[in-house]
Amino acid sequence: MKMKSNFKLWPVGQGLFYSGTIKYENNQNFNFVYDCGSSSMNIDEIVDHYVETSLIDKTLDMLVISHFDEDHISGIPKLLTEVKKIKKIFIPYENGIENYLLFLAFIYGNDGNINEKIDEIILVNSTGPENENNRDFEELNTSIEIEDNFSLPNIKVGVFKGSSIKYRNLWKFKFYNTYLRKTNFSSKIKEEIINLIKDSGCKGLKELLKKLNSPVKNDENCDKEISVKNSLKKIYEKYCSSSYGNSKQNQSSLCLY
């Protein structure tokens, strides 16, 4: 099978935006992005240019997020706006669904929306035992138990235990998790989301994300009300907004080869 590949490191300044296209028979493409962010304000223009020039049908097969510092993910809300579909998003795994919740807090706290845009969010645990029969991109077997109050309609969430996947025997992608240091902050993210759901009078995450502009008390000692959207943004900023080494949750990184 004939194949042609094209890769590009986009000029975003401080941050990272890397894209790739693998072209094969009958003009079919496999498109992927590794990180999409910058400290520069022009990231949205660059994302626009990428979608217009590289995604003919506005479908992205794979988005890989290395970590959650803002200069690596600031362009994702814009990317979600411009594409029709992102089939799979891979994020680093660290002790449960906390990084999944942190990802949602960032997206919805920054005017993003994943409704009907994403098929699957996969947390990658490359330190797990390798399953040789579970490597095909289109048929990955992932599993994780998510409480009903954290699930979202039509979006599958799973954990991939392994270090490599392949796409139609054309290309092999290898993942590697790096851990800077262990923290106990991850469990607090889940706790804060639970409290926000409760304080907003909602029954679960699905309902909460439909009330982004509704007011919620900032805390029990504060009479000032802020919106659900701003509360989610504050949760993200509390745990992972810094790109200078002092973020609390950004102690793991997902490398892609």
Regions found by a protein language model. Name each.
Residues 2-5, 82-257:
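Flexible, acidic/histidine-containing loops and adjacent segments that form or flank the divalent-metal
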Residues 2-53, 58, 256-257:
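Conserved beta-strand hairpin/beta-sheet module of binuclear metal-dependent hydrolase folds
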Residues 10-17, 36, 78, 83, ...:
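Generic hydrophobic/packing signal
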Residues 14, 40, 68-73, 95-98:
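Active-site environment of divalent metal-dependent phosphoester hydrolases
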Residues 25, 50-52, 78, 102-109:
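Generic alpha-helical propensity signal that fires on short helical segments
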Residues 30, 43-91:
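Active-site metal-binding motif and surrounding structural segment of the metallo-beta-lactamase
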